Design a protein with these regions (language model features):
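Extended, folded cores of ATP/NTP-driven motor/assembly subunits in large transport
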Residues: 1-416
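Short glycine-biased active-site loop of nucleotidyltransferases that positions the nucleotide triphosphate
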Residues: 34, 119-120, 517-520, 738-744
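Glycine-rich phosphate-binding loop of nucleotide-binding enzymes
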Residues: 34, 47-49, 57-58, 63-71, ...
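Switch/coupling segment of Walker-type NTPase motor domains
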Residues: 49-55, 80-103, 107, 115-120, ...
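P-loop NTPase motor domains
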Residues: 60-63, 67-73, 406-457, 510, ...
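Phosphate-binding P-loop/Walker A region and its immediate neighborhood
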Residues: 97-98, 202-271, 385, 389-473, ...
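Conserved P-loop NTPase motor cores
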Residues: 326, 455-456, 464-482, 487-492, ...
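P-loop NTPase motor core of the ASCE superfamily
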Residues: 551-590, 741-838
Length: 838
């Protein structure tokens, strides 16, 4: 018998089809009452599993199975999986009061991102779980109530006592499931009302936000008309306008073998169904891939061990009888499938008796919507094909659309009962309807969106770690040209527009000056500080450290300048003594003073090294590092964004070993170390103590290769934590970072962009807290691939580890075209920047 015949035979008549439509009487937070029964409703959270290892999936599955069996037992339950879009107005409401009105124009930044949310049409998945709490009253009591109503004696639909009892039952379920990976919450009256309205033609009607919904308000919420057709339904609004077409497709066949995690997770398939659409533009007809969002409804109940054992034993006995009958009645071999069925049921019966497995009876429906019949057929084809690729077969449900549609209504019951499936607990809960992607801070500002099975705005605050007593360092790593520096600027700006803060961004390549333009665009004080002759001694280690700490830092810097073994010996043996003398004796100690002391030494080697250092101090970069100090430190202590640049820097490429660095490269790295240390020291000042402070340190991989580089980074990481100053690192080399356990321990966040070598990918995986594997390496490599055009490089896509150690894929995005142009490092954007600057 083929599938079509099975469906036709299955779609017969049964008593449940004749049930009257439900009469909804009251909705409140967590509860829905019909005339016959009460239901508890919960919103299901998202567990971040998209990037998790298989062991984490297994642990999550086991926990959910145990929790559901404990919380709901054999009660009739309903899962609703619904797709909508994130709305900019919801985002604006969530950040209301976050921006200091006396500081810049953070509200405009938030509005721009709200507009971006609407522009992107980000899909939002909502999963809700309903549990039938049982019949409200006995049959005679219901009949009496209907009789009284007919004679005009109208009582309140739900008494306070009944409401309280139902809430107690709901909270018992909540207590168990909230502590599970489902992380459920009582559904708000707004969420339940919205869920009901989706099955009517009133999708745009006002949804109550609080309180209870009953009487006329409830009637108004449900006021609509549904007209069934053989293979779809039409929905009309209260004005009798046709607003939507829907088709409810029952799932009639699952794969014979379900694995979890694996092919049991058909809910995940719903998140990635697409179709090809033709679009006319000025150049002719082109095609584009667009998503098809199909909802799903699953009605189910767990079966007790006794019921499940009886059912499986009956199936085993039937298979055994078939085998024996076939063996007696024919000389041919017994069909293989009969023997397999007997063996499989015997094995399952053993598992049930041991308590390791239970069964679930379920009926699954996929709901496809469209604004026209033509679009509906296209969407149905896309859904049917996508599920068919996973060996999941859906039927059109001919001549059953009315009953299938009613089934989707919360408060109704299973009507088409002959399409049920009996599955093991792993097979059913292996749908992982709670799995998705989640990352970031719920209350912070937006800088992109989480990209995975579930999609949501990515909200983060890299400058606020100290406020929760956390470590304060964040790492950005990836290949050049993949958007990591732009992402860093977006997150820095997102924090900076909230309230007065002090942010220093070192720009040694000269490509982040656009951040100052963006800051000024939103009325935030910002400036580019170009270090020059007037900043002599600005990067002096004596400016950055206390008298007790500075001598060692000066010694390390001078060791870096040594060009041969003799100078290195002097720097190692003598420079610390002279630096200590300078610290103890000079009124205003400086590296320049240390060099003068060395020049006055009686040791010829020390004199020769001092002469060399004096020559270096006369160069533009050398003057900033070790020249005679001036009062111009180059950095403002006022709140705002201060971008520090230095003309003439020569940064060594990764291919050049430290021993081959020339004098200019050594001085350049010394300048970076000195200015970074000075900025951190400045952040500890009394004037900045009460505000957020952030220092962004680029080219970390270069600093690590310098003399004492590892110790320097470890030191500034600890300084940042001590001074409650957030440190932001930018590097192309994950392996060198991973080799510093002290620095890794200070990381409260990691952003990894595309990397192409196995060593870098594995190091990045460990920094993210993921298991290095072929799958993880492929995921990191794919970050730079544009899914819509293989000829393009994807920019701004990263794997992000937040401070809760959640890891998800994030697409960083600009709030507006203006910000995109101002932050661009493309030479073609120069004109726009010049216009803004003027």
């Amino acid at each position: 018998m083929d599938v079509v015949e099975k469906v036709r035979n299955a779609l017969g008549f049964n008593a449940e089809r004749a049930l009257p439509t439900p009469v909804h009487q009251l909705i409140c937070d967590g509860l829905l009452f019909t005339e016959d029964h009460a239901e508890a409703w919960f919103t299901v959270g998202v567990q971040n599993l998209d990037t998790a290892a298989e062991a984490v999936w297994d642990e999550s599955l086991d926990s959910v199975k145990k929790s559901m069996l404990q919380a709901v037992g054999e009660s009739n339950c309903m899962i609703r999986i619904m797709w909508s879009e994130h709305r900019g107005e919801d985002y604006l409401r969530s950040v209301q009061g976050r921006y200091d009105a006396s500081w810049g124009n953070g509200a405009a930044w938030a509005r721009d991102y709200a507009s971006k949310i609407d522009e992107l049409h980000l899909p939002a998945r909502t999963v809700m779980l309903g549990v039938n709490l049982g019949e409200r009253t006995s049959g005679p009591a219901r009949l009496m109530r209907k009789t009284e109503k007919a004679f005009g004696f109208q009582h309140g639909p739900v008494s306070d006592a009944e409401l309280a009892d139902a809430m107690v039952a709901a909270r018992k379920i909540l207590k168990v499931l909230a502590a599970s990976p489902l992380a459920v919450e009582l559904a708000s009256v707004e969420a339940i009302s919205w869920m009901l309205s989706r099955e009517s033609g009133r999708a745009k009607a006002r949804i109550p936000a609080t309180g209870t919904v009953r009487g006329a308000a409830l009637g108004h919420l449900l006021a609509s008309k549904m007209v069934p057709h053989p293979d779809h339904v039409e929905l009309f609004d209260e004005h009798d306008n046709l607003v939507a077409f829907k088709a409810i497709l029952p799932i009639v066949s699952f794969p014979e073998e379900l694995t979890a995690p694996g092919n049991a997770d058909w809910v995940e398939v719903l998140s990635r169904i697409t179709k090809i659409r033709e679009v006319a533009d000025g150049y002719g007809i082109r095609t584009e891939e667009v998503p098809v969002r199909a909802d799903a409804t699953i009605r189910f109940n767990n079966l007790s061990r006794q019921s499940a054992g009886k059912m499986v034993n009956e199936a085993r006995r039937t298979a055994k009888e078939q085998r024996q009958s076939a063996a007696k009645g024919s000389a041919e071999e017994v069909p293989e499938e009969v023997e397999e069925a007997e063996t499989a049921n015997a094995r399952l019966l053993t598992q049930i008796k041991k308590g390791g497995t239970f069964l679930v009876e379920q009926s699954s429906r996929v709901i496809v919507s469209a604004s026209s019949l033509e679009e509906l057929e296209e969407n149905i084809d896309a859904v049917t094909h996508a599920l068919g690729e996973e060996d999941i077969i859906v039927a059109r449900g001919e001549n059953e659309q009315r009953d299938l549609w009613l089934e989707n209504l919360p408060g109704d019951a299973l009507r088409v009962t002959d399409l049920n499936h009996i599955q093991t607990d792993n097979g059913f809960y292996g749908t992982f309807f709670w799995a998705g992607s989640r990352c970031g801070d719920e209350q912070a500002g937006m800088s992109g969106f989480v990209h995975g099975t579930t999609v949501e705005p990515f909200r983060s605050s890299i400058s606020s770690a100290g406020e929760r007593g956390d470590t304060t360092s964040t790492l950005y790593s990836g290949r050049s040209g993949r958007g990591k520096t732009t992402a860093m600027m977006l997150e820095l700006l997102s924090d900076l527009v909230e309230r007065p803060a002090w942010t220093v961004l070192f720009d040694w390549k000269g490509d982040t000056g656009g951040a100052a333009l963006v800051a000024r665009h939103y009325k935030i004080p910002a400036s580019i500080v170009e270090l020059g002759e007037e900043h002599s001694g600005a990067a002096d280690m004596f400016r950055a450290f206390s008298r007790a700490q500075a001598p060692i830092a000066v010694q390390s810097m001078l060791m870096m300048q040594a060009k041969d073994r003799r100078q290195a010996d002097v720097a190692t043996s003598a420079s610390l003594r002279f630096a200590t003398e300078e610290a103890e004796e000079a009124e205003e100690p400086s590296t320049w003073g240390v060099i003068q002391r060395m020049a006055a030494s009686n040791d010829a080697d020390v004199q020769a090294f001092a002469a060399y250092l004096l020559d270096l101090a006369k160069t533009p970069i050398g003057r900033i590092v070790m020249g005679a100090p001036t009062a111009n430190a180059g950095l403002s202590s006022e709140p705002g964004l201060w971008i520090v640049q230095a003309a003439g820097l020569s940064l060594p490429s990764p291919e050049i070993s430290f021993s081959d660095w020339d004098a200019q490269q050594r001085l350049s790295v010394a300048l970076i170390q000195g200015m970074t240390s000075f900025a951190l020291g400045m952040s500890s000042s009394k004037a900045l103590r009460e505000m957020r402070k952030t220092v962004a340190v680029p080219e970390v991989h270069i600093l690590l290769r310098a003399t004492g580089g590892a110790a320097f980074l470890d030191q500034i990481a600890r300084m940042g934590r001590a001074f409650n100053t957030s440190l932001v690192y930018d590097t192309q080399d994950c392996t060198s970072i991973l080799s510093l356990p002290g620095l890794v321990e200070q990381l409260q966040g990691v952003r990894v962009f595309q990397l192409t070598t196995k060593a870098q990918q594995d190091a990045a995986a460990e920094l993210l807290g993921l298991e290095p594997s072929e799958q993880t390496r492929a995921r990191i490599l794919a970050l730079g691939r544009d899914e819509t055009d293989i000829r393009k490089v994807a920019k701004g896509r990263a794997l992000v580890r937040d401070w809760r150690d959640q890891v998800a894929e994030v697409q960083f995005t600009f709030p507006s075209r203006t910000v995109q142009e101002l932050l661009s490092t493309d030479p073609n954007a120069t004109k726009k920047k010049e216009e803004m600057e003027s």
